[in-house]
Swiss-Prot record:
GO cellular component labels: cytosol; peptidoglycan-based cell wall; plasma membrane
Isoglutamyl lysine isopeptide (Lys-Gln) (interchain with Q-Cter in protein Pup) cross-link, renumbered residues: 173
Enzyme Commission (EC) number: 6.1.1.15
InterPro entries: aa-tRNA-synt_IIb, aa-tRNA-synth_II, aa-tRNA-synth_II/BPL/LPL, Anticodon-bd, Anticodon-bd_dom_sf, Pro-tRNA-ligase_IIa, Pro-tRNA-synth_IIa_bac-type, Pro-tRNA-Synthase_IIa_type1
Protein name (record): Proline--tRNA ligase
Compartments, record wording: Cytoplasm
PANTHER family xrefs: MITOCHONDRIAL RIBOSOME PROTEIN L39/PROLYL-TRNA LIGASE FAMILY MEMBER, PROLINE--TRNA LIGASE
Free-text comment on this protein's domains from its UniProt entry: Consists of three domains: the N-terminal catalytic domain, the editing domain and the C-terminal anticodon-binding domain.
Taxon lineage: Bacteria, Bacillati, Actinomycetota, Actinomycetes, Mycobacteriales
Organism: Mycobacterium tuberculosis (strain ATCC 25618 / H37Rv)
GO molecular function terms listed in the Swiss-Prot or TrEMBL record: aminoacyl-tRNA deacylase activity; ATP binding; proline-tRNA ligase activity
Summary of the function given for this chain in its UniProt record: Catalyzes the attachment of proline to tRNA(Pro) in a two-step reaction: proline is first activated by ATP to form Pro-AMP and then transferred to the acceptor end of tRNA(Pro). As ProRS can inadvertently accommodate and process non-cognate amino acids such as alanine and cysteine, to avoid such errors it has two additional distinct editing activities against alanine. One activity is designated as 'pretransfer' editing and involves the tRNA(Pro)-independent hydrolysis of activated Ala-AMP.
Length: 582
């Protein structure tokens, strides 16, 4: 196929968009692959759509290879199935809801577990029909509070979501591993650098869960890994290494001190080191109690106290994952006014217990550990408050931040921090959705068997940005051959009529060899054409320029930057095709 740039719907930009934060956002707009419509909404222009379709093709190849069958559901979905699973409420403000002219409720689908489950239930009734894997590549919608980074976090996006249905746990495990391996092949073919990390299931439900994260310093997802063992996990899924309990006998009694104006950890530590407590005090010796209000879907709001060592901050993502599917918010001044026993900056376990406030603490706060914490009165703290003797929490919670150097949960060494972009997520859902819809089939013994499910997603449109994020330089995009809009960008950098005719003939020869060609036949200067060729990022650039008169053309490798001259003879197209496919 030959596409002439003189006919292509394309306009490149020389300057970065003012609101673009990351490289992929800047380059995809500058190169004319996408255009913004509204916050979180983008149009796909011809070049961008070709990249998107190439990625879809790779995904279809690998999904079909593991026995997946493609279907397509509507994006506009009725309320009833989501009420059955309680996700109509759980999703809160993150979905787009609307009513038809008769007042019936609908949403724009964020995911389709309910529809897949109901469809399989309606079509199949025997164990003989399984195992089964269905998938779709479809536009999804989420009302992101802060869409950012172009198509990396948009309100409308393309996803591949697949679902496996099996009659037992062994079948689910096999389907899960088949998808895991298929995802590795997909991302390898797309030349994406990625890591597989343990993850939490969130609103999806289920048990085993892993994320595929594309390594990127601009990624929203923090993850950790242990270089000694290969352990890797999203920060939400990291389990804190719980220390051993300590003996309580012989520890000094807790003492309340007047600490003055010390509402912060820093001011409390400063006081402690001036108070001659007989030791040097650090923030790690203090117990910070954070109050939040929690609301379960469709339920009432309750107070919850989170206790963490004073040298740690509460991580919003870890806290949110631990409380899923509940919503939460920090207490404001009005909340403190309603609960006068909560003295801001001086909250301790005593008032929490006396007022029946649920209290969850970091796993490091084990019996026998001694703490400096609030005494529930302005300007007063208690020193030497011992867990298991002076206070007992209602449980533990993984809410404190994870840090570089923390011990790996497997005990093999320290954790190293990194950032990534989520490109895939696989879950062993189990029977969460088949329970909700009583999706049973007759087993081999004639008795009902409850189906078990797996859920597997890939961010298709996000992958366009991820590949651009990982494959670019200061000149522009550098698409891997698997996803590039065209195999070769053929630049006519010579106004001579014979050179133009030769370039056009070369394009036709390449086309006959199955090479897709973008032919820059515009009446523009060579400098403009070269800049556009580098910006657009085809893996190979062929230049028909001044050397044509001497029987020579240039072949440039966009990745390595290397240029070599080829003889413009009978084998020219074959030589270029060999380089492109080799």
């Amino acid at each position: 196929m030959i596409t002439r740039m003189s006919e292509l719907f394309l306009r490149t930009l020389r300057d970065d968009p003012a609101d673009a934060e990351v490289a992929s956002h800047k380059l995809l707009i500058r190169a004319g692959y996408i255009r913004p419509v509204a916050p979180g909404l983008y149009s796909w222009l011809p070049l961008g759509l070709r990249v998107l379709r190439n990625i879809e093709r790779v995904i279809r190849d690998e999904m079909n290879a593991i026995g997946g069958q493609e279907i397509l559901f509507p994006a506009l979905l009725p309320r009833a199935p989501y009420e059955t699973t309680n996700r109509w409420t759980q999703y809160g403000d993150s979905v787009f809801r609307l009513k038809d002219r008769r007042g019936n409720d609908y949403l724009l689908g964020p995911t389709h577990e309910e529809l897949f489950t109901l469809t399989v239930k309606g079509e199949y009734s025997s164990y003989k029909d399984f195992p089964l894997t269905l998938y779709q590549i479809q536009t999804k919608y989420r009302d992101e509070a802060r869409p950012r980074a172009g198509i990396l976090r948009a309100r409308e996006f393309v996803m591949k979501d697949s679902y496996s249905f099996d009659i037992d746990a062994a079948g689910l495990k096999a389907a899960y591993h088949a998808h895991r391996e298929a995802y590795q092949r997909i991302f390898d073919r797309l030349q994406v650098r990625y890591v597989i990390v343990s993850a939490v299931s969130g609103a999806m439900g289920g048990s085993a869960s892993e994320e595929f994260l594309a390594e990127s310093p601009s990624g929203e997802d923090a993850f950790v890994r242990c270089l000694e063992s290969g352990y890797a996990a999203n920060v939400e899924a990291v389990v804190t290494a719980r220390p051993d309990t300590l003996p309580i006998d012989g520890l000094p009694e807790a003492v309340v001190h007047d600490t003055g104006d010390t509402p912060t950890i820093a001011s409390l530590v400063a006081w402690a080191n001036e108070a001659d407590l007989g030791r040097t005090v650090t923030a790690a010796d203090t117990l910070k109690n954070v109050l939040i209000k929690v609301r379960q879907p469709g339920g009432d709001t309750e107070l919850l106290a989170i206790g963490v060592p004073g040298d740690r901050e509460v991580d919003d993502k870890r806290l949110g994952a631990a409380l899923e599917p509940a919503d939460y918010a920090l207490l404001d001044d009005d909340d403190f006014a309603k609960h006068p026993f909560l003295v801001k900056g001086y909250i301790g376990p005593k008032a929490l217990r006396e007022n029946n406030v649920r209290y969850l603490v970091d796993p490091r706060i084990v019996d026998g550990t001694s703490w400096i914490t609030g005494a529930d009165q302005p300007g007063r703290h208690v020193v030497g408050l011992v867990a298991g003797r002076d206070f007992t929490a209602d449980g533990t919670i993984e809410a404190a931040e994870v840090r570089e150097g923390d011990p790996s949960p497997d005990g093999a060494g320290p954790l190293v921090m990194a950032r990534g972009i989520e490109i895939g997520h696989i879950f062993q859902l189990g029977s969460k959705y088949t329970d909700a819809f009583t999706a049973d089939v007759l087993g081999e013994d004639g008795k009902p068997v409850r189906l078990t499910m797996g859920s597997y997603g890939i961010g298709v449109s996000r992958l366009v940005a991820v590949v651009a994020e990982q494959h670019h330089d200061e000149l522009g995009l550098r698409w891997p051959s698997t996803v590039a809009p065209f195999d070769v960008h053929l630049v006519i950098a010579n106004k001579d009529a014979q050179a133009r005719a030769g370039a056009t003939a070369l394009a036709a020869d390449l086309d006959r060899l199955g090479v897709e060609v973008l032919l820059d036949d515009r009446q523009a200067s060579p400098g403009v054409k070269f800049k556009d060729a580098e910006l657009l990022g085809m893996p190979w650039i062929v230049v028909v320029g001044r050397g044509w008169a001497d029987g020579v053309v240039e072949l440039r490798d966009r990745f390595s930057g290397q240029t070599r001259e080829l003889v413009a003879g009978a084998s020219l197209a074959t030589d270029i095709a060999a380089a492109v496919t080799g």
